[in-house]
Regions:
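Interdomain linker/hinge connecting the two RecA-like lobes of the SF2 helicase core
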Residues: 77-181, 185-186, 194-196
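Structural recognition of the conserved hydrophobic beta-strand(s) that form the central parallel beta-sheet
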Residues: 4-7, 45-53, 228-231
């Protein structure tokens, strides 16, 4: 038998192939217009698709349902029960915006609401995307769509860079200096700030670092020369760091997938291990809503 292992970046270029069986891991990554060409231009007798979470985009969901309707689902808590992954504990800790941050957040959030109303207030994301993709859209429609997306980015930036997250992060770290900790920030620059706040015990691992820098950070973390590895998205998937036993999440997104992936870094099975995950979030903000949604189907979640 011949087994070929290939990534989506290469698979979509294939044409005219016929496979007995195609297995797609992380299928949510293979559903874009470009990558789905593999399924259009090749044949297969059987198809198995796997993902930690179904895609949240309606179009991608429709594509996946046509390719491979869901026939089996297993939850993280069921995996813990079966001994597939280690037990976990998630603790959600609120932080407050400082005075000027709170003023800026309120101002931007009010503008966000204004632009959302201009878009009709119903599925504003889809409407804004439609407007910007339609050359016949009016100037007022384009202004509303651009304003909507701009305020989303501005609002998230205030949350991502909330100064009290660094203060709380340092406090948590110095109470857990014996742990091997993965830290996740919401933006690369803020991830660097988290890293610098406890230097020299941490190194950063994200897309702005060179391959040499990332390899060194990963190696020093594995050997124990540092006990904290700070990342943004680069460690969300594809890396197995079995000796990490604590995670501190300092940046939440609207996508539940990133939360599941980050938790996944900490629950890789290891005898006697309990994945300890601490999530810092800005209280009474959009971040709190995202976190509530991302953890709603998990059992062992503690809100402080």
């Amino acid at each position: 038998d011949n087994v070929e292992v290939i990534c989506y970046q290469s698979a979509y270029k294939l044409k005219g192939e016929h496979y007995d069986l195609v297995i797609c891991d992380e299928i949510h990554l293979g559903l874009s217009i470009k990558y789905r060409k593999f399924f259009q231009y090749n044949m297969y007798d059987s198809l198995l698709c796997m993902t930690a979470t179904l895609p949240e985009e309606e179009e991608y969901n429709e594509v996946l349902n046509k390719l491979a309707p869901t026939v089996y689902t297993i939850t993280l808590d069921k995996c813990v029960e079966l001994g597939i992954v280690s037990p976990y504990k998630i603790t959600c800790i609120p932080v407050k915006l400082r005075a000027q941050e709170a003023i800026d957040y309120k101002k931007i959030n009010n503008r966000f609401i204004y632009w959302k109303l201009q878009l009709g207030n119903f599925d504003a994301f889809t409407e804004a995307k439609r407007i910007l993709g339609n050359k016949n859209s009016t100037a007022d429609q384009k202004r509303a769509a651009v304003g909507f997306y701009q305020t989303i980015r501005q609002r998230k930036a205030i949350i991502d860079y909330a100064a009290d997250k660094i203060t709380k992060f340092k406090s948590i770290y110095y109470k857990n200096v014996d742990k091997k900790i993965l830290v996740f920030g919401g933006a690369n620059d803020f991830t660097d700030q988290l890293c610098d706040s406890i230097a020299p015990y941490a190194m950063a691992y994200h897309s702005k670092k060179t391959k040499k820098q990332k390899d060194l950070a990963l190696e020093l973390f594995k050997t124990g020369d540092i006990n904290v590895l700070c990342s943004t998205k680069a460690l969300n998937q594809g890396f197995d760091v079995p000796n990490a036993n604590m995670g501190i999440v300092c940046g939440i997104t609207s996508k539940s997938l990133s939360m599941i992936q980050r938790v996944g870094r900490l629950v890789r099975f290891q005898e006697g291990k309990v994945g300890d995950i601490i999530i810092l979030y800005v209280a009474d903000s959009q971040e709190q809503k995202w976190l509530t949604n991302a953890t709603k189907n998990l059992n062992n979640v503690i809100w402080k």
